[in-house]
Amino acid sequence: ICYPINCLQIYFIKLAYMDVSSILIVLPLLIIFSYLFDIFARRTKFPSVILLVLTGIIARFITSLYGYDNFAFLDNLVPVLGTIGLILIVLEAAIELEIKKEKTEIIIKGFLAALIILVINIVLVSLFFNQVIGLPYPTSVIYAIPLSIISSAVAIPSATGLITKNKEFVVYESTFSDILGIMFFYYCIRQAEKGEALIGIEPIITLIGQIFLIIIISIAITYLLFQLIQRIEHHVKFFLILALLILAYEIGKDFLKLPSLVLIFIFGIFLSNFTNLIPKGLKKYIKTDKVGKSDLHEFHLLTAESTFLVRTFFFLFFGFSIPIESFIEFEPYIIGATVLLIMYGIRYFYLVLVLNDEDSKPLLYFSPRGLITILLFLSISDYDIQKSNIVDEKVLLVI
């Protein structure tokens, strides 16, 4: 693998001086390497995203040696790619989920695991940040939340080699962890910016109200988009649906301050399970005859291909944004190792005490941090709250 990677680095060096020909060589090479990394990951169970990040880090190091150090463009590019990637990953995961009566048990198990492990992680990691490192409250909680979220962007692709039961558990748990983690994060951010306590009757009632509101809005938007799919006669229609979903997500998140990822999740689940989810009494009022298996397969394929493309460039550019000097300091390794010990300790005891199943042992290792952790952690600097100079991007990189 090393020789072609070195060839790829040479093209990265010319990044600042690229003409059209160079760009058309580099971009396909990046996609090809990501595809090869995916194949390697499936055979070795080694996450492909780590290989993508390492490739980006090496590329940055080599370009720096040749005197190119203008990486400011990554500050805006990485969050944009990450947000689109998050939407696509949750959408793809939701489309793959089957909602049937016989799936109820695994859905409940996945939700409870996501909720309980996430909450305990946040509590213990924030206590470590507060009592040992000295981060004030609520800054310690806000920094703990992104680090406590299981990344569906990494967990779902890595679970392909598991037995069906465990694979479904990973999909449900990681997706619910993403959604719950994002809701908790923005809730705590709003409370911290207002200078109010994180736990209280009024703010919790407000949060519950927001959840019900976004569910109602999501159902309404899902119905409209579902009807739109059936009415579009143009041969290109699913990219329009994706564009509308991204628009609705961003409006809900930035302007209405709602957990908009719920919208993406509900739409994906409904689209792939509408025959089971529409009540019998409403089926005669809701048209479904123009949405066939071929349409669903086409949309799923489009989502999967788009996810692969965006994920490739997100993790490559994230790695490219990391200076090699981040690996020199020793303190981030201590903090990161302690956080990981807490997280995997909690996960181990949960699996032993709650699931207590021989087949569930591999699930211990399916608790990665990735895209959503990176996005939320880096976004902390955008808010009017007290920041930390100790728990920074270096600690994030280690974890």
Regions found by a protein language model. Give the residues of each.
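Transmembrane helical cores of multi-pass secondary ion antiporters/exchangers
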Residues: 12-399
